[in-house]
Each structure stands twice: as structure tokens, then as C-alpha cells.
Amino acid sequence: MKKIEVHNRCSDFDSYRAARVKSLFNAESGCNFVLVAELPADETWWRIGLIVGPSGSGKSSIGKQFWEGETLTDLSAGWPADRPVVDAIAPDGDFNAVTSALASVGLGDVPSWLRPFHVLSVGEKFRAGAARVLSEAPERVIIDEFTSALDRQVARFGAMAFAKSWRRLDGGRQCLLLSCHRDVVEWIQPDWIFDTATGKCLNAQALRIE
């Protein structure tokens, strides 16, 4: 297990309104944030891990430290505006692999493959981003804000399709997902989950017991 410590600090404001808030709600200053997690970053037995918790609870900060040299992946970033999705995904890769990835995550509307990413719907953008990750098939990937902007029905099918497709990839590839929605736990069936709200890390067996 790898110990990850998050220490975030900002200015402690002493304005009238800040003082009123502290007094009325018995709130602390809010300038210090500390989170300690013991996570299986260096272990190879798992395929999909999940860090879940409310916004501002340290998920992204943990993700940035999880694997040395690995940055957070934004599914919506880095798409060219002058190329259709089918050309933008793994441009040097196999055509059939790209179309299979698009279909596997539920982006089966072929005309959407011929549009640039920025004109797609929110749900289509998520699926296209997921298909790009699957096509690139990195040994390790950390996906930030997983399903965060999606309608939950769309998120359900998208998350299930991605998790199923990821587990089909060859080799022991590992994917860490960061999400503010607990409903994804049921849909992706992670091998382990860390909840920033409780500070607990549970494996799949413990999750089933709970």
C-alpha cells in the first residue's frame, strides 16, 4: 500500500462576512485541508480503482500523486476542432479497433463519428472520450471527473460499458477513476474504492459485504 498525503492551504480571511460565517455556523477557518490515504497504487492485482467523494474533498489531489509521472486525464481535452471524432481517435491506429471502441461504449450512432468533438452532446462527448482511452489502451490511466457532468441514466450505461470494455483489454492495464457520484460504484464494480468522506479504502469483497 502506498501512503498519500494531501496538504492544501489558502489564506485565512478575517473580513466581517468571513467572521460572521465562522460565528454563525461554528465553522473553522477553512484554510487548511489535510487528507491521508493508504492506497494500492503499487499493487498489480486490480484493474479498476475508484476514488469517490464530494467536490473539494481531495480526489484530484490524490490522483495527482497516485502514480509518479502520470497526470489526470480529462476526457474532453485535446480534441481537434477540424477533424471528425473517427479521425481524432488513435489517428495512427487500426480503423476497426477505433470503430469497435466507439460501439463498445455505446456511441453507435454512426453519423456522430463524422462530427468534430465540440458539436457532440454531453453524453456523446463522454462516450467519445471513453472510446479514445480504450483505443489508446495505456498501461495506466487516471480519469478525473468520471461521469460528473452526465445525466445519471446516461452515466449508468456509459460507466457500465466503459468498465466492461476496459476489463476486456489485454494485459494488466489499470484505470483509476475519480468521481463525485457514489452511484458509479454499482455500475463499474471497482476492485477497490476509497471514499474521501470516510477515509476508508475497501476492496471488492468488503464492498459486497457492505
Q: Positions of the model-derived regions?
A:
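Conserved ABC ATPase signature
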Residues: P116-K125
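ABC ATPase nucleotide-binding domain signature region
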Residues: A41-L107, H181, E186, T198
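Walker B catalytic motif
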Residues: I142-V154
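Conserved catalytic loops of ABC-family nucleotide-binding domains
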Residues: A161-H181, V185-W187
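Hydrophobic anchor residue at the start of the ABC signature
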Residues: A130
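Pre-NBD coupling/linker segments of ABC/ABC-like ATPases
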Residues: M1-D42, P80-A81, E210
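H-loop (His-switch) and adjacent beta-strand-loop-beta switch element
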Residues: C180-I209
